[in-house]
């Protein structure tokens, strides 16, 4: 467990591992950038650039997509090496439904577990029961119903999915706009209409009412998938994201350290076009991308999950 996680637990006056503590830890990451890293050296670059957390994995999504095959939880030694290398929180991915991979990650002391569609699903009917763990979970969603189902399972953070490993931000935009539009729709409904909405969303009525009353999710909402430039990150913040995950876009680019710092600054100053213009200068080549609309449906990672 990182120092950041220990501090969050020590500050809490209630049971460690409770929904409130988990959500509170996620809240501390708001406004930040979480970066995929595959080595301790990359983790240090991300930390020095101002990342709020790192995601430890053996292959970034672009490589997973290019190499194909079954993608699983990363090697524990690799994850442990990254935990030892940095002071910021460390996340790691488990396959959808693979509760034993999640148990291993918790035993390793990661600060957050990502039940991730980037890896090959282990269960096509059931997601992990996240209430069984003290470690908080982040899960992806393409729409509000999916987000609320994951929250009902215990997710402490939601990220709009996008299409990982492409460098194409269009799906991230679509999913964030969809989630925000569905939240706004609930906020304008009469209370008796929310019963029907809950059925349409296939989500618990109590969560639907909470979203309608508050005009937002009960957990932190980040964005992910295809974010490759400072402008991409800033746009997603404008659309309602409370923070940004960046995967292949940093360490598949020409100048990772400079691009990482630029994306952090753009995320923090997303309302200032002059800052975004300044940090976007001289970044070198962005990652070589793939247009999402050219991908066969069977190759679209965001389609995984239900």
From Swiss-Prot:
Name of the protein in question: Pyridoxal 5'-phosphate synthase subunit PdxS
HAMAP family: PdxS (MF_01824)
EC id: 4.3.3.6
Keyword field contains tRNA processing: no
Binding-site residues for D-glyceraldehyde 3-phosphate, renumbered to this chain: 177
Family: Belongs to the PdxS/SNZ family.
PROSITE patterns noted in UniProt: PDXS_SNZ_1 (PS01235), PDXS_SNZ_2 (PS51129)
Active site as annotated: 93
Subunit: In the presence of PdxT, forms a dodecamer of heterodimers.
Cited function: Catalyzes the formation of pyridoxal 5'-phosphate from ribose 5-phosphate (RBP), glyceraldehyde 3-phosphate (G3P) and ammonia. The ammonia is provided by the PdxT subunit. Can also use ribulose 5-phosphate and dihydroxyacetone phosphate as substrates, resulting from enzyme-catalyzed isomerization of RBP and G3P, respectively.
GO terms, molecular function: pyridoxal 5'-phosphate synthase (glutamine hydrolysing) activity
Metabolic or biological pathway: Cofactor biosynthesis; pyridoxal 5'-phosphate biosynthesis
Superkingdom of source: Bacteria
Keywords: Lyase, Pyridoxal phosphate, Schiff base
Pfam families per UniProt: SOR_SNZ (PF01680)
Species in which this protein is naturally found: Corynebacterium urealyticum (strain ATCC 43042 / DSM 7109)
Gene Ontology terms describing biological process: amino acid metabolic process; pyridoxal phosphate biosynthetic process; pyridoxine biosynthetic process
Residues that, per the record, bind D-ribose 5-phosphate: 36, 165, 226, 247-248
Catalytic activity reported: aldehydo-D-ribose 5-phosphate + D-glyceraldehyde 3-phosphate + L-glutamine = pyridoxal 5'-phosphate + L-glutamate + phosphate + 3 H2O + H(+)
Lyase among keywords: yes
């Amino acid at each position: 467990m990182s120092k950041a996680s220990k501090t969050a637990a020590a500050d809490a006056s209630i049971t460690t591992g409770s929904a409130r503590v988990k959500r509170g830890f996620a809240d501390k990451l708001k406004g930040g950038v979480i970066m995929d890293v595959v080595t301790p050296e990359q983790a240090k670059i991300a930390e020095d650039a101002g990342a709020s957390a790192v995601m430890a994995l053996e292959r970034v999504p672009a490589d997973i997509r290019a190499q194909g095959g079954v993608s699983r939880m990363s090697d524990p030694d690799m994850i442990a090496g990254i935990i030892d290398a940095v002071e910021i929180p460390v996340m790691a991915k488990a396959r959808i439904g693979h509760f034993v991979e999640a148990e291993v990650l918790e035993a390793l002391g990661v600060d957050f577990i990502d039940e991730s569609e980037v890896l090959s699903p282990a269960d096509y009917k059931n997601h992990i029961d996240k209430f069984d763990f003290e470690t908080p979970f982040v899960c992806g969603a393409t729409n509000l119903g999916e987000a609320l189902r994951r929250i009902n399972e215990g997710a402490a953070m939601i990220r709009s999915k996008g299409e990982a490993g492409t460098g194409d931000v269009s799906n991230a935009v679509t999913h964030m706009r969809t989630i925000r539009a569905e939240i706004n729709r609930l906020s304008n409904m009469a209370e008796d209409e929310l019963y029907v909405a809950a059925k349409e969303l296939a989500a618990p009525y109590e969560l639907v009412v909470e979203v309608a009353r508050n005009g937002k999710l009960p957990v932190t909402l980040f964005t992910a998938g295809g974010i490759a430039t400072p402008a991409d990150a800033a746009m997603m913040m404008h659309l309602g994201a409370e923070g940004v995950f960046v995967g292949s876009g940093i360490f598949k680019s020409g100048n990772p350290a400079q691009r990482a710092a630029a994306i952090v600054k753009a995320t923090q100053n997303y309302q200032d076009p002059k800052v975004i213009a300044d940090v976007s200068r001289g970044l070198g080549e962005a990652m070589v991308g793939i247009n999402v609309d050219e991908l066969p449906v069977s190759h679209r990672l965001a389609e995984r999950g239900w």
